[in-house]
């Protein structure tokens, strides 16, 4: 039928034609995707070859046939769309086949192109409705429809290019070329998501989500939900529509978070609870493989001392190799998000604060300029996002005097000027330095951790040693989330809306253990991907060497992290978004004063941090060796201060002890940080002692040291 000339049809006849085309097909087995890829590669070769030969031939011609002009002017479309189709078909699972030896999708695409040659989306939707009334397409087939349509068009073009003499002699008419390139242009410039979602039988079930959340999720999250339905259908040997309906039926009977059908796709797939990984097996694997490597080194070096001293450097190699393999074997775990197309809603009211010291009269205006930049970069978040400076003064041996007051007043004036310029939306939070008995200096209580704790107390309406020096205080009462940044961290375009969208998703809502006061499911904190600022990364040769390329990756996708991908728990590094209520419940008065320098790991563990790899912040980095090692010293010192959290009982914020609420994975992270801090020491010690032994021992010690450092 597809070889006959196209005949215009009304809507009813179009649907009937599609249904008849489906009835003619008889399913038989599967066809590997590599067969489609092979056909498409051959077609692209023919098109490229024809274009090259005709480009040379046309130089000697005074006039060109119309079809040749079409090909030479538009061949790039065929190459571009063909390459995209090849990428989509790469390493795909087999597709359903027909008795003709082709895939069902190829037959569907060919008849669709005959019936709707201009690929008008409204008409194509009618065609798919008719076709699927007889033979429903799977989610995977729908996801590959556009690439297969492109491949079919490239195949048609290759057929015309096979007759070079006919092209040169004008036997191929321009009317044969026009619909092919018109179709490729439509595929290239069209937005196909709405069409494919409308044609999806699974989508029609999922949009009935009793909680009402599914239609308001972003496009990627909805697509992953459909993919999860397909995975579960395959696992339990169900039809995709049947699996989706089962999840919907369970959600209709559920209450609270279980009323969202996503619960029955991820938390209790089709009613069968999944048991989360604890991290014990991962820690045992690293430990066991490290011991095995040490025993092997003992035999190779001929002395147990080398094995004992090098077990920590060997563990560096083992862990890095294991993580490298796991990141490639385990698919990334994207975080579900709400779309927030109208901006941050009232129930997601968000305050973004830059935590910083005021070190001079110019500090406040500089920080205010940052806030203005962040506001302009995140206008899509709307009025429910506001920004502020969370300011302290540097440590001092005397109470705050006229100088400190002048610095604060300069910051207040800068924020007030922004409020006047933009009609509000900016804040200055300030803490007057208090005397610390331990340090015998005037300083902000518990530095950054204390500043955030007091900010949360202020937001919760509790007494706090924090003053609102500028900004509308009444708006703060209903703040639900806080984005915390350092002075050298940049909030990139659209990042605030992405962060809040992740926090608002029902599957990410934190579940707090009332006894332990830690988050046991969901996430109360998200850590975005952090890249190095482009300017900071190029400030010195040292920064280039240790800071990487720097800048924002505009083509970046979901980031991989072993902890998040395997255990649904990321690692907090001090920049991100957290829930005000969960922070107040889990962290207020939780830790002893003056004992914890590195609090990010503990906060992330208590709040069950997640990694939002789709969002990115940029941060500064040390540009001198001294700055790098000073920062490393602070980190290592802070890691060792967390040693008590490896035990059964840990200090609390009231001078007593409580049962350690940390899960095994969080304790492993603490232990791993301690191991990593000792590794260079043992490496150096082994190299020094290796010089006193045989050359073989020294060679093994040096080899392990180099590989450990490089890994």
Placement of each model-derived feature along the sequence:
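Alpha-helical bilayer-embedded segments of polytopic membrane proteins, i.e.
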Residues: 150-160, 274-323, 528-532, 572, ...
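Basic/hydrophobic alpha-helical interface regions
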Residues: 3-7, 15-20, 26-33, 37-64, ...
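Internal catalytic domains of large membrane-associated glycosyltransferases
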Residues: 171-280, 333-656, 660, 667
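ATP-dependent phospho-/nucleotidyl transfer catalytic cores
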Residues: 6-99, 424-481, 643-676
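Active-site activation/catalytic loop segments of kinase-like enzymes and analogous catalytic loops
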Residues: 101-142, 149-166
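N-proximal low-complexity "stem/linker" segments adjacent to membrane-targeting elements
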Residues: 64, 312-319, 323, 328-351
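Non-transmembrane, amphipathic alpha-helical segments
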Residues: 6, 25-42, 62-73, 77, ...
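Short, well-ordered loop/turn and helix-capping segments at boundaries between secondary-structure elements
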Residues: 114, 133, 137, 151, ...
């Amino acid at each position: 039928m597809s070889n006959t000339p196209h005949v215009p049809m009304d809507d009813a006849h179009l649907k009937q034609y599609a249904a008849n085309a489906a009835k003619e097909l008889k399913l038989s087995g599967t066809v590997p995707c590599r067969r489609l890829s092979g056909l498409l590669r051959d077609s692209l070769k023919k098109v490229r070859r024809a274009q090259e030969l005709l480009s040379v031939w046309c130089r000697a011609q005074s006039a060109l046939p119309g079809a040749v002009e079409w090909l030479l002017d538009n061949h790039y479309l065929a190459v571009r769309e063909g390459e995209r189709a090849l990428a989509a078909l790469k390493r795909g699972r087999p597709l359903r086949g027909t008795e003709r030896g082709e895939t069902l999708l190829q037959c569907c695409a060919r008849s669709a192109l005959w019936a709707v040659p201009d690929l008008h989306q409204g008409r194509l939707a009618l065609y798919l409705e008719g076709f699927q009334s007889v033979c429903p397409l799977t989610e995977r087939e729908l996801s590959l429809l556009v690439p297969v349509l492109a491949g079919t068009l490239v195949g048609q073009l290759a057929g015309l290019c096979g007759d070079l003499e006919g092209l040169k002699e004008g036997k191929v008419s321009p009317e044969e070329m026009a619909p092919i390139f018109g179709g490729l242009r439509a595929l290239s410039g069209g937005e196909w998501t709405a069409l494919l979602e409308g044609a999806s039988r699974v989508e029609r079930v999922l949009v009935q989500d009793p909680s009402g959340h599914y239609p308001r999720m972003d496009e990627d999250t909805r697509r992953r939900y459909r993919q999860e339905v397909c995975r579960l259908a395959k696992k339990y040997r169900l039809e995709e529509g049947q699996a989706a309906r089962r999840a919907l039926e369970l959600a209709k009977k559920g209450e609270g978070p279980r009323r969202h059908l996503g619960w029955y796709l991820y938390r209790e797939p089709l009613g069968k609870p999944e048991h989360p990984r604890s991290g014990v097996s991962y820690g045992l694997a690293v430990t066991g493989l490290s011991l095995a490597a040490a025993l092997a080194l003992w035999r190779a070096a001929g002395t147990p001392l080398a094995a004992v001293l090098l077990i920590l450097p060997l563990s560096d190699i083992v862990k890095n190799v294991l993580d490298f393999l796991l990141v490639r074997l385990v698919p990334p775990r994207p975080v579900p998000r709400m779309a927030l197309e109208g901006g941050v809603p009232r129930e997601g009211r968000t305050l973004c604060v830059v935590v910083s010291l005021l070190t001079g009269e110019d500090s406040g205006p500089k920080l205010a300029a940052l806030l203005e930049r962040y506001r302009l970069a995140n206008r899509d978040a709307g009025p429910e996002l506001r920004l502020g400076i969370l300011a302290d003064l540097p440590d001092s041996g005397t109470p705050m005097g006229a100088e400190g007051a002048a610095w604060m007043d300069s910051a207040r004036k800068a924020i007030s000027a922004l409020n006047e310029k933009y009609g509000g939306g900016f804040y200055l939070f300030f803490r007057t330095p208090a005397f610390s008995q331990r340090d015998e200096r005037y300083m902000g209580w518990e530095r950054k951790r204390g500043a955030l704790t007091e900010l949360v107390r202020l937001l919760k309406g509790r007494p706090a040693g924090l003053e609102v020096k500028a900004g509308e205080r009444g708006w703060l009462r209903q703040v639900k989330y806080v984005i915390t940044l350092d002075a050298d961290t940049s909030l990139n375009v659209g990042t605030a809306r992405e962060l809040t969208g992740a926090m608002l998703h029902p599957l990410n809502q934190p579940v707090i253990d009332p006894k332990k006061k830690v988050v046991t499911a969901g996430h109360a904190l998200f850590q975005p991907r952090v890249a190095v600022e482009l300017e900071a990364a190029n400030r010195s040769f040292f920064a280039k060497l240790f800071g990487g390329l720097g800048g924002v990756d505009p083509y970046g996708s979901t980031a991989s992290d072993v902890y998040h991908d395997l255990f649904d728990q990321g690692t907090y590094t001090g920049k991100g978004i957290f829930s005000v209520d969960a922070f107040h419940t889990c962290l207020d008065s939780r830790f002893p004063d003056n004992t914890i320098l590195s609090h990010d790991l503990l906060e992330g563990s208590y709040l069950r941090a997640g990694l939002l790899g789709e969002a990115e912040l940029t941060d500064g980095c040390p540009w001198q060796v001294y700055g790098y090692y000073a920062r490393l010293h602070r980190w290592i010192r802070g890691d060792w201060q967390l040693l008590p959290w490896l035990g059964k009982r840990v200090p609390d914020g009231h001078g007593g002890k409580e049962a350690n609420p940390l899960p095994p994975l969080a304790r492993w992270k603490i232990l791993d940080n301690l191991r990593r801090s000792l590794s260079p020491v043992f490496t150096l010690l082994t190299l020094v002692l290796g010089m006193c032994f045989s050359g073989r021992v020294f060679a093994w010690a040096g080899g392990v040291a180099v590989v450990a450092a490089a890994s």
